[in-house]
Amino acid sequence: MAKPSKTTTKKKVKKTVVDGIAHIHASFNNTIVTITDRQGNTLSWATAGGSGFRGSRKSTPFAAQVAAERAGQAAQEYGLKNLDVEVKGPGPGRESAVRALNNVGYKITNITDVTPIPHNGCRPPKKRRV
């Protein structure tokens, strides 16, 4: 019986990125953390729902903290050191996600709020009666 030929594959070399942008989308129901390079190419991402939190626990500051830690640790493979943070949305996980990225070991250079503000656009949802 013939021996199977060994195929040599080149190991994919990860590019090194020093500066990046952390996009934190904090809605009322979930928090999405995406870390990109300066051009906007995604390096890593994590969500509160994908981090094991379901239902109402998904919309907690602790879930946002865990999601930010997971995204930050995954992006460290690229040699990332400095982050600009762009926060979007009114969710409860805004500050805790930024704090978690700082605790992972990134130097946060500036924090920007990029929440879209309508010039009297769509009608907002009605107020909750609890």
Curated annotation (Swiss-Prot):
Gene Ontology CC: ribonucleoprotein complex; ribosome
Superkingdom, taxonomy of origin: Bacteria
Entry keywords, A to Z: Ribonucleoprotein, Ribosomal protein, RNA-binding, rRNA-binding
Molecular functions per Gene Ontology: rRNA binding; structural constituent of ribosome
Record keyword Iron present: no
GO-annotated biological processes: translation
Gene3D superfamilies: Ribosomal protein S11
Function: Located on the platform of the 30S subunit, it bridges several disparate RNA helices of the 16S rRNA. Forms part of the Shine-Dalgarno cleft in the 70S ribosome.
Assembly information from the UniProt record: Part of the 30S ribosomal subunit. Interacts with proteins S7 and S18. Binds to IF-3.
Family assignment from sequence similarity: Belongs to the universal ribosomal protein uS11 family.
Protein name: Small ribosomal subunit protein uS11
Species the sequence originates in: Teredinibacter turnerae (strain ATCC 39867 / T7901)
Gene: rpsK
